[in-house]
Amino acid sequence: MYKRQEVCEHFVGRRLALDPVSQSQVLAPMHRGESGVANLNRILQSRLNRRTTSIKLGGSEFKVGDKVIQNRNNYDLGVFNGDIGIIESVNLEDGSLNVDFERRSVQYQKTDLFDLALAYAVSIHKSQGSEYPVVIIPLLKAHFMMLQRNLIYTAVTRGRKKAIIVGDPAAFAMAVRSSESKTRRTLLKERLSEA
């Protein structure tokens, strides 16, 4: 288990011999907080992408070379929730940009940008169904509400070659010890018997 400040060092490739954008993925338990998705994306963007030309929209800033994720199905563009790509070009005149989704270029108009987010870090929940060569998982006690064994299992199994857990060893221990899964009360049995 590594110290939490090492998450960026691992991700930017100082310790891993791989491309930090295309060959690894940071998976965070939560969106908010010091090691949440939002903060990690800001930090990682500043370290990995020093370009200055950008489109700013709301609280987001998009630059050529940024790793981004589609957050909603868009059938008109042919991109779907969870698709990850790299920004190829930015047009400052009309606020559009092009994203490469595995060798398929998609043009986003300014109104479509609300469905994009930085993807240097994504939530563990969002990563379900995806795989990456290497995953880096920051764990802190601040995530106590989310620290469940099944969450750690989900995160670790996203990595094909390696999973690196960064953070507080006590937080990891909390998660591993926590085997209580919340019982769902849906009334499904009763509804099926009525049908």
Describe the function of each predicted region.
Residues K3-L77, E88:
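Conserved helicase motor core of P-loop NTPases
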Residues D83-A195:
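C-terminal accessory regions
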Residues F80:
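Conserved flavin/dinucleotide-binding core of flavoenzymes
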